[in-house]
């Protein structure tokens, strides 16, 4: 075994958190099954007021696995899951793992062309989605190799009183699927397992691929990140070790989506593999989030800065009792020092005995791999690494470490590092590099510093990326879509300041000769974008320019446009009163 010689300046500053752990080497499902046997009376998750125990969950997962086997899903097959946070998504995710398949997790609100790309890139043989998204899947199905589409409905997992209300409101808006549609409905699918009389369980180890999540990687082009059983199981153990105050049965509000590493890895798998209880939130609104925190007396909540900004403004939170909270985590985007101060003050005023703890990570490491320790806060820091995780700061693109306090590229290593980029060996080799210290490092493309006690400070993204409400938006992808339109000669996409989302997407377009720069053209381009771009990545505005600024080598100077927008935003933002400035 190679000796690890990487520096660990954070040793001695992690409090009760150990530096090393012994990791479970089985599958994700096996981790759940062990916990279910250990805590047979514990509730695994709640959905719209309906609780499900660990034994009930395991039984449903096994039924789902038998049904997958019956329709022909085999070891190594990819199954696309395009679902919100709901019970069927949980059952399918772990059932795919149980039969030895790989879960391909995608956003259910993705545009049709994006869905087609995800299905083909992963070579999925089966897909599951909700009834309200049926038309998107059916319209592109013939362009893929998908054999079976399983259609679930939220109403199937609701208690009778809640179901009645749902059918009178949200359920009425969903178009009925034709009876002869070539799909398998969830209830029908789950009954298919009764025909499975052979072994449906496939033995898997920690090193086996288990999940595909999507990210722009180091270049901004969408690619699948292949993650293993060990990646997820290790993350679960690390999260619990980094939070010694956790007890089995503690409740986490699971509002972050399942196609996101944090939602899947922390809010769901960490809790379910460690005996916790997930409060599943199928559709996020700040109002519903706030209501659930107090209704269930949640112990842990996690979100992006946008979410917390919204919570501060909610009238319903004025008298809320937050004394049950043990951990409040922020990630997905940089948390400003001022917002953290406001949040900490808000938590204190509402009886919470904790402060916001900021973390940092990438999809290449599932999600967070460092976190502010519970006993020690440093202003502006994103914390220290999890057990067995290593972080170092180097001259960008090299293996040369920079002195403490000097800005450089953030590199990550540890048990949650991805297996590879699917079908992109060159980018895998560019992102994962073995060093003389015995570790394989992820080159994040992000800039930061580290102090002499091992605390890390995030400084910015070296790669061009917009973070809007915690979602990663890659300008290059949107520019490619715009440039493909015959009305467009050239485009440039940037992120502009937004009080709620932190950043929103704006497109600058140079139109093709003869195309009028008017509202009709703008609306036509917006309509075109809506068919090709997910809602969270849609431009909020398209501004027409006769020419786009260029760099000396002829590239579009996006930084010039960013500076223009920042100056415009600063001019529109009222200055603080003199009295406040003195404070």
For the regions a language model picked out, list residue spans one by one.
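Conserved structural elements of the adenylate-forming
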Residues: 58-63, 191-194, 206, 225-247, ...
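Conserved AMP-binding/adenylate-forming core of the ANL superfamily
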Residues: 41-86, 90-94, 111-116
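Conserved AMP-binding A3 loop
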Residues: 53-55, 201, 210-234
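Conserved pre-ATP/AMP-binding loop-to-beta segment of ANL
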Residues: 176-214, 221, 244-251
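AMP-binding/adenylate-forming catalytic core of the ANL superfamily
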Residues: 110, 127-129, 301, 414, ...
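Conserved ATP/PPi-binding loop(s) of AMP-dependent carboxylate-activating enzymes
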Residues: 384-388, 400-433, 473
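Gly/Ser/Thr-rich phosphate-binding loop
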Residues: 298-303, 312-379, 390
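Conserved AMP-binding/adenylation subdomain of ANL enzymes
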Residues: 233-251, 259-302, 310, 314-315
